[in-house]
Amino acid sequence: MFESIDEAITQLKAGGMILVVDDEDRENEGDFLALAETASPETINFMATHGRGLICVPLTEEQAERLQLGQMVSHSTDPHGTAFTVSVDHSHTTTGISAFERAETVRALADANAQPSDFKRPGHVFPLVAKNGGVLRRAGHTEAAVDFAKLCGAKPAGVICEVMNEDGSMARVPELRIIADQHNLPLVTIKDLIAYRRKTEKVVTREVAISLPTEYGDFKAVGYTNTIDGKESVALVKGDVGNGEPVLVRVHSECLTGDVFGSKRCDCGPQLHAALKQIEAEGRGVLLYMKQEGRGIGLINKFRAYKLQEEGYDTVEANERLGFPADLREYGIGAQILRDLGIRDMRLLTNNPRKIAGLEGYDLNIVERVPLQMEAVAENERYLHTKREKLGHMLNL
């Protein structure tokens, strides 16, 4: 069904194009992808004719900052966190819309010697800012384009375009397979790109391991750092988790208010303690504690979201009012930590389908979902209903 990442790299190095599809639980879309530095009028015309989507140029954060490409909007509500900047045309262009002029703009955006003054704003080409760490941090087409460019030894920028069917609907894998065969293009998945990078790169470092006696039992606490954002994470390990048998795992996002202060606004604290109790009872398991306060928006922004909830907004609406997706968490770092601990198959303590998809996208096998439902109280009943209705959490309320 899909070609290998090596085949895709070979095609791109030769100046060609590939088709890249993401996870069916994410956008479930395919994009044409080429290197920005080799973009030609023919590249742009092909994408516009056969892709029919928006032609964008994924860049590194450093290049976008150097070219002074500000965010398209100050508060994005895109649930996938796509980081559009202001659109541009190269200063040498006329209208900027022709395939020839868009190709010139695309190549210039990849040029390490380009200057902010080389571009007119707004324009007809849409830069996107890739997350540092690429698909190991965010499993999107933006990051895939920059990762492929780096793997090719090219300037770290790509050009992408979503693929639609002739009737205007989004092309899914069966249609993308036909298109790839018609035009002799490798069809690859972001999941395979993640696996490829995981085999050749490591972004987490095991720093130190200690014994940690707790009120629930004795654990080994393993401290990790990562090279993407420098954040620290902790794995509380019980027993031998690297023997190949499925391991009971809880990936828990930091919640100062719930975990430490006992806040009743959420169910985080009770979930944390229940997970530790369950792991201790089984005699084997891992609780991974991630620095993802407020579903990834940070402590102060979580307080701002709480303030909006006091004014009548629910937890999802509050995040969106602040310009954040409903859930900003990413699972690549956690997945690498679990693999470092020797875990491949797991029984995941979660109610969140997005967490399942996020970890499986990093080549981890979830053999069972173990529910972790806490009894609702008056203070968090609306919060839990919102998680079920708007975020798809599997809760019985």
From Swiss-Prot:
Keywords: GTP-binding, Hydrolase, Lyase, Magnesium, Manganese, Metal-binding, Multifunctional enzyme, Nucleotide-binding, Riboflavin biosynthesis, Zinc. The active site is at residues 327, 329. Residues 200-397 are annotated as: GTP cyclohydrolase II. It catalyses: D-ribulose 5-phosphate = (2S)-2-hydroxy-3-oxobutyl phosphate + formate + H(+); GTP + 4 H2O = 2,5-diamino-6-hydroxy-4-(5-phosphoribosylamino)-pyrimidine + formate + 2 phosphate + 3 H(+). The keyword Metal-binding applies. SUPFAM superfamilies: RibA-like, YrdC/RibB. D-ribulose 5-phosphate binds at residues 26-27, 31, 138-142, 162. Disulfide bonds: none annotated. Residues 1-199 are annotated as: DHBP synthase. Its cofactor is Mg(2+); Mn(2+); Zn(2+). The keyword Membrane does not apply. Mg(2+) 1 binds at residue 27. Mg(2+) 2 binds at residues 27, 141. Pathway: Cofactor biosynthesis; riboflavin biosynthesis; 2-hydroxy-3-oxobutyl phosphate from D-ribulose 5-phosphate: step 1/1; Cofactor biosynthesis; riboflavin biosynthesis; 5-amino-6-(D-ribitylamino)uracil from GTP: step 1/4. One of its GO terms (molecular function) is GTP cyclohydrolase II activity. GO terms for biological process: riboflavin biosynthetic process. Binds 2 divalent metal cations per subunit. Magnesium or manganese. The record marks 124, 162 as: Essential for DHBP synthase activity. It comes from the Bacteria. Catalyzes the conversion of D-ribulose 5-phosphate to formate and 3,4-dihydroxy-2-butanone 4-phosphate. Catalyzes the conversion of GTP to 2,5-diamino-6-ribosylamino-4(3H)-pyrimidinone 5'-phosphate (DARP), formate and pyrophosphate. In the N-terminal section; belongs to the DHBP synthase family. In the C-terminal section; belongs to the GTP cyclohydrolase II family. HAMAP family: RibA, RibB, RibBA. This is Riboflavin biosynthesis protein RibBA. The gene is ribBA.
